[in-house]
Amino acid sequence: AAARRFSFRKDIMYTDIYLPSLPQELLAMAETPVMQRLQRIGMHCGCEYTAYPIYRNAAAPYSRYTHSLGTAAIVWHFTHDLKQAVAGLLHDVATPAFAHVVDFLNGDHLRQESTEGRTHSMIASSPELMALLARSGLTLDDVDDYHRYPIADNDSPRLSADRLEYTLGNAHLVFHCPEAELRAICGDLFVGKNEENIDELCFAHAEIADTFTRLSLRQSEWFVSDDDRFSMQYLAELLHDALSSGVLTMDDLYTDEQTVIARLLSAPALAARWQDYRRITGTQSGVQKPNGSYAVKVAAKKRSIDPLVQTSGGLRRFTAINADYAAKLAAFRADDFERWVWAVYE
């Protein structure tokens, strides 16, 4: 199957849509081993190793490294503050193999923040990164928590650099959205003050916000689809059993995905389950749990964006000026995930 040719070596860099180039300080930090590891950690939480058509048809894999560079570029473009841009660059530095699958493993399905605790220690344990921070006049405390900087990150459904980047990254690499459309979205954004008088990325024109929110909602639905939730729970249980049997350690999860996969393949029973995972082409669901099939009933964090848009009456949330989007977003948020989901294999 085409999905088996998955490789991060083909990762497409499209981040010049945000900025033609990054400051040298950021580029040097991106070259450190702790950041280079993220080239081998995917954005799709292990789902890209399945045979789902959406990944088979993707333009290229999408790594945490590409996402991190893009986030840093967006923050720098709107703030020209190195401290904030570095925090954006490093925000995923502690992402484990299969990313939010480890949150499922930790029982953190709904918040998906359990893996962020290592960010401080991952930066501190990198002599190369610490030296570059010192050379730039930055401290560890300046850059170890991008939540401090609202352009870099804020609470959903607000728009931040992080949410903007993965929305446009997926739009380009997975949904095949033309680069010109992405540039139009980026070019329409400006920094305004939200309801709490805090800086937030805003759209100047409702028609551009409409284009963006269509992409955003499509992504939101995909992130909590039956396929996605099933795959993440399947992998979480596989990792749990690998950890319980000593095939993996928690520290192994903070190497890269190929290392973790090699460990799984070293144990015959786990290897068979991994190979079954690679053959999943989709899912089915129902109220009743099927007899004789592995099935899950699991909820997940609903990510959504309701951006601010400039109107003649000031800045307003897009749901306040577009009833169609408001209805679709409400329907998305209403899903209670109260159904059993099981796999379809190739």
Feature map (PLM): residue ranges:
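Short alpha-helical catalytic segment bearing the HExxH-like zincin motif
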Residues: 84-92
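Histidine-centered, transition-metal-coordinating active-site segments
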Residues: 6-83, 97, 101-346
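Acidic, Ala/Val/Gly-enriched low-complexity intrinsically disordered segments
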Residues: 1-3
